[in-house]
Swiss-Prot record:
Residues 1-23 are annotated as: Disordered. Pfam families: Gpr1_Fun34_YaaH (PF01184). GO terms for biological process: meiotic cell cycle; plasma membrane acetate transport. The gene is mug86. This is Meiotically up-regulated gene 86 protein.
């Protein structure tokens, strides 16, 4: 029996059409699989690479723009004059150093004003060595790395002050026990404090055009050193002058509070607090001058 040629031709055409459709479907499926694999590959990443590059470029441009800006005196940055933003890749070390200084100074000053009628002040030895001393040395190194010469010199110096003060009362160093006469020991302590009074006065001269809190910190600290030095130089019966010790302790408490105030100015921001610490800028500072004079001096500092 002969086959119908028209039916066979139609059957062959239908077969070719089905194979063509299968080929198209297979090609379409392969593209879907490739797209899914590509999405799966990039799914492990937070964002495409070109978005990361654009975001990084914007951050670099913003940091470069901040480097060009000049900021006024600030105790929060431990900067007594106009300065550029330096701590770009890490945080501001000034609040850490200021807090270490404030804590140790406040504790010793409480003993000096006879708070709680504590007779022996050796409790301050450990904080003086590890918080007031070591912490301020670390803050000094970070300030130096960020380009803040003032902060590095001051934090490093007072860190060494607390380390040396603690070593005086540590028996292993045998400093206090080496004096047979208590009056000689007290007089030596007085000379030691006079040296720190001179250094603090030099630092004070660098803050006369900054802020009120910044200037008050070193002004009260300088008076504290002077009164304590006079107390140890004017000894009676082997003991320092009690009245001068207590008055010096009061100035030390005020200095510690001023240091905490400046530290809080660097910690409290609009992102983490409901308030920010105000800056009381002296009218004779750069920020207190007129806009034209301030811009002129900023341009001069920028040229330097």
């Amino acid at each position: 029996m002969s086959s119908n040629p028209s039916r066979s031709n139609s059957r062959s055409k239908n077969g070719d059409l089905e194979s063509g459709l299968k080929f198209v479907d297979n090609d379409h499926d392969s593209k879907d699989i490739e797209a899914r694999n590509r999405n799966h590959f990039y799914g492990f990443r937070a964002e495409p690479i070109y978005d990361q590059t654009e975001r990084l470029a914007n951050q670099v441009a913003e940091l470069q723009e901040q480097q060009k800006r000049l900021f006024g005196p600030s105790g929060a940055d431990f900067e007594p004059n106009i300065h550029r933003l330096r701590y770009i890749n890490y945080g501001n070390p000034a609040p850490f150093g200021l807090s270490a200084f404030a804590f140790t100074t406040f504790l010793l000053s409480l003993f000096n004003v006879n708070a709680g009628h504590v007779k022996v002040s050796n409790m301050v030895t450990a904080p003086a060595a590890f918080y007031g001393g070591l912490a301020q040395l670390l803050a000094s190194m970070w300030e130096m790395a960020s380009g803040n010469t003032f902060g590095g010199a001051v934090f490093g110096s007072y860190g060494c002050f607390w380390l040396s003060y603690a070593s005086i009362f540590i028996p292993w160093f045998n400093i206090q026990n080496s004096y047979d006469d208590p009056n000689d020991f007290n007089y030596a302590i007085g000379l030691y404090l006079i040296c720190w009074f001179i250094f603090t006065f030099l630092v004070l001269l660098c803050t006369v055009r900054s802020t009120l809190a910044f200037f008050s910190l070193f002004m009260s600290l300088d008076v504290c050193f002077l009164l304590l030095a006079c107390a140890f130089l004017r000894t009676s019966d082997g003991s320092p002058n009690v009245v001068l010790i207590r008055v010096g302790g009061a100035f030390g408490i005020f200095s510690a509070c001023a240091a905490w105030y400046n530290a809080m100015a660097g910690l409290a921001t609009i992102e983490n607090s409901f308030f920010t610490v105000p800056r009381a800028i002296f009218p004779w500072s750069l920020e207190g001058l007129g806009p034209e004079e301030a811009n002129r001096r900023r341009m001069m500092a920028d040229d330097k």
